[in-house]
């Protein structure tokens, strides 16, 4: 969203200036493909996708830091880049396994913040694993061991597969032109090790219980700041002027802030997109993807956001955002009514500003209570807590 807002109240200026882009994907999975198996000793650890670069270092930690608080070098190395072509190749290789008569993938995990360290350790958290540093794909030869292990080059998937099925996966990966690397073994010793066979260098060797079982809880302390806002002054004779001003807000009368660029019909399953009519104005309240080319079933998505309301009252902002999303999605015929709906809660918040952690707690609490009252689940979400901006 390029929607910005500022408000002067007493000696404080409140508002939001940062440009936000929220992107997400929708889809469905078969129930028999949803449950992971437990890796067994001597199973192979495999990576599908691209090479390692100095990308996404610091991951979640940097994304939640104040903009301008860290050096430009750290922030630059934390930036994520994308390679959709590589993502598609890796996804097609996984899809090839899923659509086979029997899916031989034991367990699979994406590469998020923390890179190989996060992905591969979670694959073997019940068993243990040994990763050969020499087998990890390197796109930048200047990477240190820390950068090689922890970067967030995103177009990659980590998976575990039995050694006897490696050839099947390799054939599918070759067909889809997806790079594939066998980088380690499941050990069964409940340790997670990165080691170079050529040099003997071992930058990491941990007990799994030290990684997963004893993480200290983070305690955040903040104080509640009460802000009293003056009542809005208005003149009933200027209703036409007020109406025109409100309708000029992009978040009110136009869905332009979602996006109205590029072709969103690739694949032929887009039943309803943002743009509508001969002028392709982005006015639709809901987007709909068909599940296939012949049935009348699909997946509907909508969005709700209420940043101005949340500035005044975080609880009201949470409830308003959910309400907006629901009033947008009612134009799709939901098979099971509200029971058909799942929410993704996305928090864009200036944490570490005095009083903002307390406001965020209130907002999350309100989401939870409101969703429970409605009988709607919130299985996922995303936080971006670096919305605090330092101006020179």
Residue spans for each PLM region:
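Glycine/proline-enriched, intrinsically flexible loops and inter-domain linkers
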Residues: 1-392
């Amino acid at each position: 969203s390029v929607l910005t807002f500022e408000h002067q109240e007493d000696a404080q200026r409140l508002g939001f200036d940062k440009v936000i882009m929220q992107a997400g994907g929708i889809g469905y999975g078969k129930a028999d493909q949803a449950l992971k198996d437990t890796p067994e000793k001597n199973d192979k650890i495999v990576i599908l996708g691209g090479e390692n670069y100095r990308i996404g270092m610091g991951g979640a930690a940097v994304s939640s830091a104040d903009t301008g608080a860290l050096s430009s070098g750290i922030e630059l190395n934390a930036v994520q880049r994308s390679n959709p072509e590589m993502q598609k190749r890796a996804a097609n290789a996984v899809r090839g396994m899923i659509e086979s008569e029997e899916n031989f993938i034991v367990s699979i995990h994406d590469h998020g913040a923390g890179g190989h360290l996060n992905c591969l350790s979670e694959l073997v958290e019940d068993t243990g694993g040994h990763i050969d540093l020499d087998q990890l794909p390197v796109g930048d030869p200047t990477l240190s061991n820390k950068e090689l292990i922890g970067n967030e080059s995103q177009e990659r998937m980590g998976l575990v597969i039995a050694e006897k099925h490696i050839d099947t996966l390799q054939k599918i990966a070759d067909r889809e032109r997806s790079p594939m690397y066998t980088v380690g073994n499941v050990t069964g010793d409940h340790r997670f090790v990165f080691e170079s066979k050529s040099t003997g260098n071992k930058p990491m060797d941990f007990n799994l219980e030290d990684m997963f079982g004893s993480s200290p809880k983070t305690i955040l302390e903040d104080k509640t700041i009460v802000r009293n806002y003056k009542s809005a002054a208005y003149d009933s004779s200027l209703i036409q002027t007020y109406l025109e001003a409100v309708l000029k807000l992009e978040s009110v009368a136009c869905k332009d802030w979602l996006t109205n660029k590029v072709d969103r019909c690739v694949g032929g399953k887009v039943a309803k997109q943002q743009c509508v009519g001969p002028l392709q104005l982005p006015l639709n309240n809901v987007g709909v993807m068909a599940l296939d080319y012949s049935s009348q079933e699909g997946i509907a998505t909508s969005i709700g956001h209420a940043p101005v309301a949340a500035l005044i009252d975080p609880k009201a902002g949470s409830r308003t955002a959910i309400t907006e999303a629901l009033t947008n999605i009612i134009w799709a015929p939901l098979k099971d009514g509200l029971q058909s709906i799942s929410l993704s809660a996305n928090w864009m918040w200036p944490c570490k500003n005095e009083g903002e952690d307390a406001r965020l707690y209130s907002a999350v609490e309100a989401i939870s209570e409101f969703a429970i009252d409605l009988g709607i689940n919130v299985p996922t979400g995303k936080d971006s807590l670096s919305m605090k901006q330092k101006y020179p």
